[in-house]
């Protein structure tokens, strides 16, 4: 049986292959990284096959969110605020629709909360 790291890598590769097909339409992708304490999200525009440009980024380390953080651990409430902050920053740059790149993470918990927060102002 495969261990959790192998399953994560398989899931990540499967998600990235699906996104590669969708982002060929010119949509930027909303990429998510989660650590034990923080969650990070960024809107990335792919330029060619090997280059990419970060349009907007937000995390629980941003001053707007970090001052409200009661615990040094990300939860659903703060993940939703990160999604909302990222959506505002992307809208200010003229981005209205993105492709959600969850990486190898399951669409559950803080990943779902971040997506719901971003979905309030972005289309995906």
Swiss-Prot record:
Subunit-level organization: Part of the 50S ribosomal subunit; part of the 5S rRNA/L5/L18/L25 subcomplex. Contacts the 5S and 23S rRNAs.
Native organism: Orientia tsutsugamushi (strain Ikeda) (Rickettsia tsutsugamushi)
Protein name according to UniProt: Large ribosomal subunit protein uL18
Keywords for the protein's UniProt record, in alphabetical order: Ribonucleoprotein, Ribosomal protein, RNA-binding, rRNA-binding
Keyword Nucleotidyltransferase assigned: no
Disulfide bond entries: none
Pfam families in alphabetical order: Ribosomal_L18p
GO MF annotations, alphabetized: 5S rRNA binding; structural constituent of ribosome
NCBIfam families on file: L18_bact (TIGR00060)
Functional summary from the UniProt entry: This is one of the proteins that bind and probably mediate the attachment of the 5S RNA into the large ribosomal subunit, where it forms part of the central protuberance.
Protein family membership: Belongs to the universal ribosomal protein uL18 family.
InterPro entries per the UniProt record, alphabetical: Ribosomal_uL18_bac-type (IPR004389), Ribosomal_uL18_bac/euk (IPR005484)
GO cellular component: cytosolic large ribosomal subunit
Cited Gene3D superfamilies: 3.30.420.100
Presence of the UniProt keyword Flavoprotein in the record: no
GO biological process terms, semicolon-separated: translation
């Amino acid at each position: 049986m495969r261990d959790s790291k192998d399953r994560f890598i398989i899931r990540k590769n499967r998600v990235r292959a699906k996104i590669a097909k969708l982002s060929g339409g010119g949509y930027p992708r909303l990429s998510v990284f989660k650590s034990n304490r923080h969650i990070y999200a960024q809107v990335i525009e792919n330029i060619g096959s090997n280059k990419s440009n970060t349009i907007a980024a937000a995390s629980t380390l941003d001053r707007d969110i970090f001052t409200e953080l009661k615990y040094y651990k990300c939860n659903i409430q703060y993940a939703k605020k990160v999604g909302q902050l990222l959506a505002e920053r992307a809208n200010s740059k003229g981005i209205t629709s993105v492709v959600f790149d969850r990486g190898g993470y399951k669409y559950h918990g803080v990943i779902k909360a971040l997506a719901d927060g971003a979905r309030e102002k972005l289309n995906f």
